[in-house]
């Protein structure tokens, strides 16, 4: 996940990471502390204050969604190449790419080299975003021609919804919120569970806990 720095930050401890306003940071772990994230910049990693950055949620990043839930969601998509990136269940801190092809969903481990670059095969990238963009026109598979395509959205649905009730996550990959919170809907292709962003976090939430709002927030 990527974030953009809103302010300059000067590290005051050995395990903190300095950055300048406008820097793009790779957020490695959002769960270390309520107020601090672990992030990487220019090959160095350390802790950064949460309130100094703005997350850049991508519609294809689903966080800690379980592999089975990813397969269920992608199997409902109509076109080959529909994909999402999730945090690996078997290797915490790593990422997996799940892609629909035919009647199956294929999973690819996103690898990283010693310099922190991401890759699937040979070509390496500075960010997951660059990897995704490259594989929109270059197959992710060596056995079939599979080009990444965004999950189909339903544009008639609202961009924002408001929480009717408190929701506390029961599983990894779910999005917690309080009654009255506004949630940015990032994917509503599943009738029961939608993906959204709230308070800088992204995750899945139950559709029946929210109501549409007729304005942007």
UniProtKB/Swiss-Prot annotation:
Expressed in macrophages. Residues 1-58, 156-215 form the SH3 domain. It holds the Pfam family SH2. GO terms for biological process: actin cytoskeleton organization; anatomical structure formation involved in morphogenesis; B cell receptor signaling pathway; branching involved in labyrinthine layer morphogenesis; cellular response to ionizing radiation; endodermal cell differentiation; epidermal growth factor receptor signaling pathway; ERBB2-ERBB3 signaling pathway. Gene3D superfamilies: SH2 domain, SH3 Domains. Residues 60-152 form the SH2 domain. Phosphorylation of Tyr-209 in the C-terminal SH3 domain reduces its binding to SOS1. Disruption phenotype: In a conditional knockout mouse model, Grb2 deletion induces a rapid decline of myeloid progenitors (CMP), myeloid/erythroid progenitors (MEP) and granulocyte/macrophage progenitors (GMP) and a progressive decline of long-term-HSC and intermediate-term-HSC numbers. It comes from the Eukaryota. The modification N-acetylmethionine is found at residue 1. GO terms for cellular component: cell cortex; cell-cell junction; centrosome; COP9 signalosome; cytoplasm; cytosol; endosome; Golgi apparatus. The keyword Calcium does not apply. The modification Phosphothreonine is found at residue 211. InterPro entries: Grb2-like (IPR043539), GRB2_C_SH3 (IPR035643), GRB2_N_SH3 (IPR035641), SH2 (IPR000980), SH2_dom_sf (IPR036860), SH3-like_dom_sf (IPR036028), SH3_domain (IPR001452). Keywords: Acetylation, Cytoplasm, Endosome, Golgi apparatus, Isopeptide bond, Nucleus, Phosphoprotein, Repeat, SH2 domain, SH3 domain, Ubl conjugation. Transmembrane segments: none annotated. The modification N6-acetyllysine is found at residues 6, 50, 109. It is found in: Nucleus; Cytoplasm; Endosome; Golgi apparatus. Its main location: nucleus. The modification Phosphotyrosine is found at residue 209. Non-enzymatic adapter protein that plays a pivotal role in precisely regulated signaling cascades from cell surface receptors to cellular responses, including signaling transduction and gene expression. Thus, participates in many biological processes including regulation of innate and adaptive immunity, autophagy, DNA repair or necroptosis. Controls signaling complexes at the T-cell antigen receptor to facilitate the activation, differentiation, and function of T-cells. Associates (via SH2 domain) with activated EGF and PDGF receptors (tyrosine phosphorylated). Interacts with PDGFRA (tyrosine phosphorylated); the interaction may be indirect. Interacts with IRS4 (when Tyr-phosphorylated). Also associates to other cellular Tyr-phosphorylated proteins such as SIT1, IRS1, IRS2, SHC and LNK; probably via the concerted action of both its SH2 and SH3 domains. It also seems to interact with RAS in the signaling pathway leading to DNA synthesis. Interacts with SOS1. The SH3 domains mediate interaction with RALGPS1 and SHB. Belongs to the GRB2/sem-5/DRK family. This is Growth factor receptor-bound protein 2. It comes from Mus musculus. The gene is Grb2.
